[in-house]
Amino acid sequence: MTDSESAAAVSVDAAAYREAMSRLASAVHLITTDGPGGRAGFTASAVCSVSDAPPTLLVCINRASSAYAALTQNGTLCVNTLGEGHETVASLFGGRTPVDERFAAGTWRRLRSGAPALADALVSFDCRIVGRHAVGSHDVLYCAVEAVAASGEADALLYSERRYRTLPRTPRSGSAPAEPARAPRAVGARPAEGPALALRSA
């Protein structure tokens, strides 16, 4: 048996995998879209940089997500990275809340694509979907970044062990002396119909 055949024969229990993944601390994002396919959005942590030449992000979405059809038809999205104080809006976008109620919880603006950009997000990446790859229940979306807006000054919002936590900002060089280091702190348990593992990929 080759190494590849041996690897393919190993079956990892899905529940054990989800429990292991819950221990990975991840940034929390709202993925939003608007256009011919309608307005939609979901909470995600399965977001990462692919390249800076050209600037490209990767976003994963479950094909069963209520936002999937709109994203597919619109072909654009905005990745809004959240900070402390965004726990409520993150939970709304991660559950079964109606679309209008989700967007009513924030103040929005438009960048280049027309996808809603959260006004007080730590940073918003306005993107055009340029490629996709199906893996299991999800699509991996490759997104060309066409505009960036950084406005928020809050501590970063993380999701780890099924709880929201915050990561204190590090002062930039030349700024005021740093306060003593603080450990990340928990700021709330996962809501009953909140993101769970779906937070990683909605």
From Swiss-Prot:
For this protein, the parts annotated as crossing the membrane are: none
Any Gene Ontology biological process = nitrogen utilization
According to the lineage, what is the superkingdom? Bacteria
The protein's UniProt keywords, in alphabetical order, are:
Flavoprotein, FMN, NAD, Oxidoreductase
Per the UniProt record, which EC number(s) apply here?
Answer: 1.5.1.42
Q: Tell me any Pfam family this protein matches.
A: Flavin_Reduct
InterPro entries of this UniProt entry?
A: Flavin_Rdtase-like_dom (IPR002563), NADH-dep_flavin_reductase (IPR050268), RutF (IPR019917), Split_barrel_FMN-bd (IPR012349)
Please list the residue ranges that the record marks as compositionally biased, kind Low complexity: 171-196
The chemistry this enzyme catalyses reads: FMNH2 + NAD(+) = FMN + NADH + 2 H(+)
**MF terms per GO, please?**
FMN binding; FMN reductase (NADH) activity; FMN reductase [NAD(P)H] activity; riboflavin reductase (NADPH) activity
Top enzyme class, one word, equals oxidoreductase
- Specify where the region named Disordered lies, as residue ranges: 168-202
Report the sequence similarity comment from the record: Belongs to the non-flavoprotein flavin reductase family. RutF subfamily.
The job of this chain, per UniProt, is described as: Catalyzes the reduction of FMN to FMNH2 which is used to reduce pyrimidine by RutA via the Rut pathway.
Q: What's the protein called, per UniProt?
A: FMN reductase (NADH) RutF 1
Source species, please? Answer: Methylorubrum extorquens (strain PA1) (Methylobacterium extorquens)
